[in-house]
Amino acid sequence: MGKVILVTGVSRGIGKSIVDVLFSLDKDTVVYGVARSEAPLKKLKEKYGDRFFYVVGDITEDSVLKQLVNAAVKGHGKIDSLVANAGVLEPVQNVNEIDVNAWKKLYDINFFSIVSLVGIALPELKKTNGNVVFVSSDACNMYFSSWGAYGSSKAALNHFAMTLANEERQVKAIAVAPGIVDTDMQVNIRENVGPSSMSAEQLKMFRGLKENNQLLDSSVPATVYAKLALHGIPDGVNGQYLSYNDPALADFMP
């Protein structure tokens, strides 16, 4: 049997690319995905058949996470890797306009849902000496105008990766930033939250990246995530936060 891999946020962007790359790299891989929108999940199911299975639901609800884990164990008897990809950017707001409830909602999605999923899946991951790959962001340690909620949630995720790697020796963990990728999030930055909430200088920077064709295709970082999930996280980078193109990850690049 091939690897059995859980991936969150598979309906679009990097998450969908991770699924596509996994199947292109290994014909025996099985993926269990979760997202809120069923239509894109149905398309993946139609494309990949009995290699792809899915759960529709809100990842902030433990019942959905348990359903995902239970489906994989019941269907294929194990979980080899987990790729925690799902996340949101908003609220994008200056510190003078902070809406704490909006921050809490973001943290529920970007951080606490992942902590919960790891906790639920950990007994199965320990059986396979599994891997947990966290999709982080350069915003964790770089300032982007009004991205306090998003950036800090990714910093928390990085620390959780380090904690997991040190406290559970049977499972490896890594947090990897994908670079600036040509996804719907970038469209939202250029057209919505950027004009309304970000500095003119940084909005110009993001628009320039698109105009100059400097945004990454999602398949590039997706390949790194997929290979880490398939081949395992090397001991030398276990518990670390790295960029997708860090020399330590050269063997995982496209």
Curated annotation (Swiss-Prot):
Listed name of the protein: Uncharacterized oxidoreductase YIR035C
Superkingdom: Eukaryota
Binding site for NADP(+): 7, 85, 150, 154, 181, 183
Active-site residue numbers: 136, 150, 154
Claim: Oxidoreductase is one of the keywords in the record: yes
E.C. numbers: 1.-.-.-
InterPro entries membership: NAD(P)-bd_dom_sf, Sc_DH/Rdtase_CS, SDR_fam
GO MF annotations, alphabetized: benzil reductase [(S)-benzoin-forming] activity; oxidoreductase activity, acting on NAD(P)H, oxygen as acceptor
Broad enzyme group: oxidoreductase
GO cellular component terms attached to this protein's record: cytoplasm
Keywords, sorted A to Z: NADP, Oxidoreductase
Family: Belongs to the short-chain dehydrogenases/reductases (SDR) family.
Lineage of source species: Eukaryota, Fungi, Dikarya, Ascomycota, Saccharomycotina
Pfam family, one: adh_short
Note: Present with 2370 molecules/cell in log phase SD medium.
